[in-house]
Amino acid sequence: MATSKPTISTSFLYETLEETLDIKPLGAKLHIGIPKETAFQENRIALSPEAVGVLVSNGNEVSIEHLAGEGSHYSDADYSEAGARIVFDRHEIYKCPILVKSAPIVSEDLPLLQLNQIIISPIHYSALQQADIQKMMEKKIT
């Protein structure tokens, strides 16, 4: 009795590989502002110099307020080397269309906010006054 070996199809040996495509930018460049946190004992900063470097290398513009990273032991030189623009005027930072903060917006910041501005930060509704929320809604803050 002759026994024959089963044949194994070679199609099981191939794996599908992902193809990496060159993604072209859509032309929309973001201008992101990082203000210095003023809350009591707030030492965090929203973006590290490494994160700023990634944003800048992807064609975006990042502005950071002077000494914003000192509580997290990042110097202005660290951010400048990563490609950020150091801004010495708090009012100028708040003119950026996108703000990134590690602490919530406080009442003192509301007059500085611009129309249709995007703010990426925590928000504590229980700590906000209804008038503050109304001002943010009037300015169409997202």
Regions found by a protein language model. Give the residues of each.
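Glycine-rich loop-to-alpha-helix module at the N-terminal edge of alpha/beta enzyme cores
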Residues: 142
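Structural/interface elements that position substrates and couple domains in central-metabolism enzymes
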Residues: 2-134, 138
